[in-house]
């Protein structure tokens, strides 16, 4: 095992050791040479899920004063260099001062100095940067690697795109588990029934509150239901359609936040876009459900179909709006939208859907 650890990249070394028992990991570390032990100790000292634990410290660097021809010859002598798509340029103090792509290097006259062709505006991260922020930067700028710098701008290592792909998958899985109210542990299938129950309890409690609220509203309109029993038949449809479109809208927004696609300042445009989507879908399904109600419940009032159709349309517009606004509000309050969006949306839609349905019925059916 020690020989495997020794040959692995530094970020993989810490990953392997972290999944082992402490005593086993320590015994393996003691078999490594002093330099390897120091590097592993440094990597494992960074916070969990940070850039420091992802980075590879075996980075190929070049001095800014050498020429492109000298750089190519130096590169040819390197074996096992990590990610040579980018060449990192340093100064006399080993500070990172620029970066050059491999393509730019090979298409530049051999006598040109690196400092004259390097890109000086560098997107870098600190070792403490959260891995989700690292993934967002890579996705936003389509980088193959991102340099990790200390407070003195010295290059500590790089986080490569292959490591970021793993992070994106892990974070997406975690967010979806949270939104579904199933906790955030990616290994949830390995947990006990009791641990799974505890993870799901808060989300289901919020749904229970929404159900109680909806039941209370229905109770207030029991006379209306007694006069027109057909109204009760469409309550599940209205709540179901509203809940579904709210979940769709909130999922789009939460994932957009996680990937950096939803930017601060564009919220109003986003809200109106989802309202438009809700109106289009609500009108379509409202017409279909209204026609169904009209020809199925022939003994009910003539305008029952109109009431049902309008209610489903209003419910879906409101649900799409709520599903969009709640994650945005939670972000403003520094509350993780992935955790809290589901309960708030579920509770709100249950109550608002029933309320709008009976208010519209009361107005147009004159009850």
Question: How does the language model describe each region?
Answer:
Residues 1-235:
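Cytosolic regulatory modules rich in charged/polar residues
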Residues 351-352:
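Active-site His/Glu-centered metal-binding helix of metallohydrolases
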Residues 65, 172-321, 325-339, 343-347, ...:
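Alpha-helical transmembrane segments and their membrane-interface boundaries
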């Amino acid at each position: 095992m020690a020989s495997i650890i020794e040959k692995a990249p530094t970020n993989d070394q810490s990953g392997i050791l972290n999944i082992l028992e402490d005593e086993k990991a320590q015994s393996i570390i003691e078999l490594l040479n002093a330099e390897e032990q120091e590097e592993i100790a440094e990597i494992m000292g960074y916070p969990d899920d940070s850039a420091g634990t992802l980075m590879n410290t075996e980075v190929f660097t070049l001095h800014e004063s050498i020429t492109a021809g000298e750089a190519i010859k130096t590169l040819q002598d390197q074996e096992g260099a990590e990610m040579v798509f980018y060449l990192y340029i340093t100064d006399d103090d080993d500070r990172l001062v620029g970066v050059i792509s491999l393509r730019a290097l090979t298409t530049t006259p051999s006598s040109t100095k690196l400092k004259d062709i390097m890109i000086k505006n560098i997107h870098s991260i600190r070792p403490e940067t959260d891995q989700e922020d690292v993934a967002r930067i890579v996705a936003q700028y389509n980088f193959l690697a991102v340099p990790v710098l200390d407070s003195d701008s010295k290059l500590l290592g790089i986080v490569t795109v292959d490591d970021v792909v793993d992070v994106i998958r892990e974070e997406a899985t975690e967010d979806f588990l949270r939104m579904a109210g199933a906790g955030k542990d990616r290994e949830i299938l390995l947990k006990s029934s009791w641990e799974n129950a505890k993870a799901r309890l808060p989300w289901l409690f919020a749904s229970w509150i929404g159900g109680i609220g909806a039941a209370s509203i229905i109770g207030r309109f029991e006379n209306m239901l007694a006069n027109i029993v057909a109204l009760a038949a469409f309550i599940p449809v209205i709540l179901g359609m509203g809940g579904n479109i709210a979940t769709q809208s909130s999922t789009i927004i939460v994932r957009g936040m996680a990937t950096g696609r939803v930017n601060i300042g564009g919220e109003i445009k986003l809200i109106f876009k989802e309202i438009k989507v809700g109106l289009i879908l609500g009108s379509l399904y409202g017409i279909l459900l209204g026609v169904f109600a009209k020809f199925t419940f022939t003994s009910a009032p003539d305008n029952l179909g109109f009431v049902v159709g309008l209610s489903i349309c209003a419910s879906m517009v409101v649900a799409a709006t709520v599903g969009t606004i709640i994650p945005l509000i939670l972000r403003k309050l520094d509350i993780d939208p992935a955790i809290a969006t589901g309960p708030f949306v579920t509770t709100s839609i249950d109550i608002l859907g029933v309320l709008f349905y009976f208010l519209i019925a009361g107005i147009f059916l004159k009850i």
